[in-house]
A protein has these predicted regions:
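Extended, composition-driven regions rather than compact fold-specific motifs
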Residues: 1-15, 30-31, 66, 70, ...
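Solvent-exposed loop/turn segments at secondary-structure junctions
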Residues: 39-42, 77-81, 112-116, 142-146, ...
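Well-ordered mid-protein domain cores that form the structural environment of catalytic cofactors
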Residues: 64-94, 98, 106
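C-terminal catalytic-base region of ester-bond hydrolases, centering on the histidine
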Residues: 154-219
Length: 219
């Protein structure tokens, strides 16, 4: 594990793990941003994920810490199907809410399939009348749901209703909704959208344009 990736705390979740990086060295969570890893063929390599979140093209974790944001990275203990991965994200959101000092709204960030799963997890919590206290959700280059996944989304209202919804689509990536910068923003299910001028970073979770856009829209 790289020295700068060592978390201040680790939370054991059912089917997953969260690495916790409080801002400014304060050993408590006050203003959290949850960043969700994509499920893979085996356990999440959270060390590698931490490298990507704080990658050379845009060190998002460092930038968040500079703004006083506490970062929680969420991964999975093993290969995770839709239901298992979604439950890990649900528990991570609820644990963060319970461990947070104060009442600052949280943010959730997911890329690729993680964006789709986080979207479903938040909508499902709302459908169950469970408070997640997430003020903003950011979907980065989300995968398109399969027919079965879309059916699951539809059963919980398709989108979370309480957070402000942000969508980032990198250049050269198919937009989740099939939209682009010339389309009417009102045709999107998201409140804000960035159609980035550059491609997705190969070394970082976001490129500079995407990272700056995200930071300016945090609650």
């Amino acid at each position: 594990m790289a020295g700068n990736n060592i978390p201040s705390d680790q939370w054991k979740l059912r089917g997953g793990t969260a690495w916790v990086y409080p801002a400014n060295g304060v050993a408590r969570v006050v203003d959290p941003v949850i960043v969700v890893a994509e499920p893979g063929p085996g356990p999440t390599d959270l060390d590698a994920f931490a490298d990507r979140v704080d990658g050379p093209d845009y060190p998002l974790r460092t930038k968040l810490a500079q703004r006083g944001k506490d970062v929680i990275l969420v991964g999975y203990d093993d290969k995770s199907d839709w239901d298992t991965a979604e439950q890990v994200i649900e528990e991570a959101a609820l644990r963060t809410c319970a461990m947070r000092f104060g009442s600052k709204p949280m943010a959730v960030v997911g890329a690729g399939r993680a964006a789709l799963l986080a979207r479903y997890a938040l909508a499902r919590l709302e459908d169950k009348r469970m408070s997640h206290e997430v003020g903003a959700f950011f979907s980065l280059d989300s995968t398109t749901p399969t027919a079965a996944e879309q059916d699951a989304l539809n059963t919980v209202g398709a989108m979370p209703q309480l957070p402000r919804l942000g969508k980032i689509t990198s250049a050269g990536t198919r937009d989740l909704e099939g939209l682009g910068p010339r389309d009417d923003p009102a045709s999107s299910q998201f409140d804000d959208a960035l159609y980035a001028s550059g491609p997705a970073s190969k070394t970082s979770l976001v490129n500079e344009e995407e990272g700056n856009w995200l930071l300016e829209r945090l609650p």
